[in-house]
């Protein structure tokens, strides 16, 4: 089975049979909790294209990752803090759930290459373009990784706004509160240039797509907030 290397870690590129069953069970549990405990509502699922694609949600709470379990049924891939992989068992569980490690605060070339490999293998990827949890209702400057990876692979980027997750589980909160959450999905942003995957990624195009993504994420967040 093919693996991808990120730092000291080696992660399976494609899921094993056990991974698929484990992810399906875990996603079902998460979706049930989202809909029952958080009364989660998802708007715009019909706009999600065929895989591979990049889901690009706003990030106000640790719950945002779990909300993705109600957005898309098949297995998603995520980046996570490399410190979470320090314990072998935890790393195996996270890998089965679609995670792979990234060193926070560094220009991690291996992590970028891993994202490209995931998308080129036909799997969908979740990236938080804000980079870390933010506060407030304004989607400010984004990191340009989503645009770069999208251009590198031709994968469309799906802007998502999540409202209510910060009320349910803000920074420092250990036990989530049963507050309503709304997820709004906007139409995908194409990363093709003249209908083709870019042979070379132009900085101007990265900036253009990043700005378009920021505006669309803001619209999605505002709509989600309105629907709370």
Model regions and ranges:
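Non-catalytic C-terminal accessory region of glycerolipid acyltransferases
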Residues: 1-21, 110-228
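A transmembrane-helix-recognition feature enriched in membrane-embedded lipid enzymes
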Residues: 2-43, 47, 87-97
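A generic secondary-structure micro-motif detector
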Residues: 19, 41, 79-80, 104-105, ...
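Hydrophobic alpha-helical segments typical of transmembrane helices
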Residues: 21, 25, 29, 64-67, ...
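Short, basic, glycine/proline-bearing loop/turn elements
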Residues: 29-30, 96-102, 129-133
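Catalytic core of membrane glycerolipid acyltransferases/transacylases, capturing the structured
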Residues: 36, 47-106, 114
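Generic beta-structure capping elements
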Residues: 45, 58, 81, 105, ...
């Amino acid at each position: 089975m093919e693996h991808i290397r990120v730092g000291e870690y080696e992660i399976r590129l494609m899921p094993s049979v056990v991974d698929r069953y484990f992810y399906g069970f875990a996603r079902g549990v998460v979706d049930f909790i989202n809909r029952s405990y958080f009364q989660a509502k998802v708007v715009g699922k019909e706009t999600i294209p065929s895989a591979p694609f990049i889901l690009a949600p706003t990030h106000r709470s640790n719950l945002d990752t779990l909300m993705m379990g109600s957005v898309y049924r098949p297995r998603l891939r995520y980046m996570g803090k490399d410190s979470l992989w320090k314990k072998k068992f935890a790393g195996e569980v996270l890998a089965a759930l679609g995670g792979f490690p990234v060193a926070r605060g560094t220009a991690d070339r291996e992590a970028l290459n891993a994202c490209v490999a995931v998308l080129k293998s036909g799997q969908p990827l979740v990236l938080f373009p804000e980079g870390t949890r933010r506060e407030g209702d304004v989607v400010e400057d984004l990191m340009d990784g989503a645009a770069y990876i999208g251009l590198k692979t031709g994968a469309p980027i799906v802007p998502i706004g999540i409202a209510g997750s910060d009320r349910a589980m803000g920074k420092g909160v250990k036990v989530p509160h049963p507050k309503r959450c709304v997820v709004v999905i906007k139409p995908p942003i194409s990363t093709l240039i003249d209908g083709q995957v870019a042979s070379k990624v132009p900085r101007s195009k990265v900036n253009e797509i990043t700005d378009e993504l920021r505006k669309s994420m803001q619209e999605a967040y505002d709509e989600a907030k309105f629907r709370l």
